[in-house]
A protein has these predicted regions:
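Short, low-complexity disordered leader/linker segments with a strong preference
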Residues: 1-9, 33-37
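Extracytoplasmic "Venus flytrap"
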Residues: 8-29, 43-53, 148-151
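An alpha-beta-alpha
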Residues: 10-14, 28, 115-165
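Stable alpha-helical elements in mature extracytoplasmic
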Residues: 20, 24-28, 53-57, 72-76, ...
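Structural motif
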Residues: 41-63, 173-187
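Beta-alpha junction/loop-to-helix N-cap segments that form part of ligand/metal-binding clefts
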Residues: 46-105
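Rossmann-fold dehydrogenase core element
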Residues: 107-117
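Conserved small/polar residues in nucleotide/adenosyl-binding loops
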Residues: 198-200
Length: 200
C-alpha cells in the first residue's frame, strides 16, 4: 500500500528494444501510473541487447536508491539479483525463474526481494499442436540458442513431451546470429518439423 502523497522512483532495465518487451514495459508503467497517479517517476533504461550493460544500469539504480527495479528479460533479472538483496525486484518476460537465477529445487516462488511474471508457454500443448498439425511427423528438430538458458530449459521439457508421443527429436543449437542460418538449414534437412524455441 502507498502512503498518501508519497513519491516513488522506479528503475526499469530492459535488455533490448523488441515489441514484446516494449509492450511489457509500457504495461508496467501504465499500471503503476493508474494505481499511483502522479506518485511514480520512472528511469527507463535499455541495455541495447548487451547483457553486460544490464549490470551497469542496475548498479546505477542501486546507487541512486530507487524504490523498485523492474527487470525486463532474463539478463536484466540476473543483473538485478546480483546487484541488490534489499531493493524489491519485479521480473517480466522471464521464462523460468529457477533457471534464470540458478535455483536448486525451485518451487515456483523465488522469495527474498524478487517476484514477477513468467512468459513460459505450456510445452505439452506445443507438443500436442505438432502432432495435431503434422500427424505424419516422425522427427522434430529443436532449434535454440545455446547462450540462452531459457531456451535450453524449454528444449529439454518439450523433448520429453515429444518422446512420450513417440516422436524422435534432435537438438540444433546456434550460438549467435552468425551461425543461425546454417544451423537452421541443418535442422530443416533433418526433420519433418522444426520447432524454434528462441528467447530474448
Amino acid at each position: 500500500s502507498s502512503a498518501e502523497g508519497a513519491t516513488y522512483k522506479v528503475g526499469i532495465c530492459q535488455l533490448v528494444q523488441h515489441p514484446a518487451l516494449d509492450a511489457a514495459t509500457q504495461g508496467f508503467i501504465d499500471a503503476l501510473n493508474e494505481a499511483l497517479p502522479g506518485q511514480v517517476t520512472f528511469e527507463n533504461k535499455n541495455a541495447s541487447g548487451e547483457a553486460n550493460n544490464c549490470g551497469t544500469i542496475v548498479n546505477g539504480f542501486v546507487s541512486e536508491g530507487v524504490d523498485l527495479i523492474m527487470a525486463n528479460a532474463t539478463a536484466a533479472l540476473t543483473a538485478a539479483a546480483s546487484a541488490t538483496a534489499d531493493i524489491p525486484i519485479l521480473g517480466t518476460s522471464i521464462t523460468a525463474y529457477g533457471v534464470a537465477l540458478d535455483l536448486d529445487d525451485f518451487d515456483g516462488t523465488v522469495g527474498g526481494n524478487i517476484s514477477g511474471t513468467s512468459d513460459l508457454a505450456d510445452l505439452s500443448q506445443q507438443a500436442d499442436m505438432i502432432t495435431e498439425w503434422f500427424p505424419e511427423a516422425k522427427k522434430v528438430a529443436l532449434l535454440f540458442c545455446s547462450a540462452e538458458p531459457n531456451s535450453s530449459y524449454q528444449i529439454q521439457e518439450v523433448a520429453t513431451c515429444l518422446a512420450n508421443k513417440g516422436i524422435e527429436t534432435k537438438e540444433f543449437a546456434f550460438t549467435d546470429s552468425n551461425d543461425v542460418a546454417s544451423v537452421t538449414q541443418s535442422a530443416a534437412d533433418y526433420a519433418d518439423v522444426v520447432l524454434s524455441l528462441i528467447h530474448i
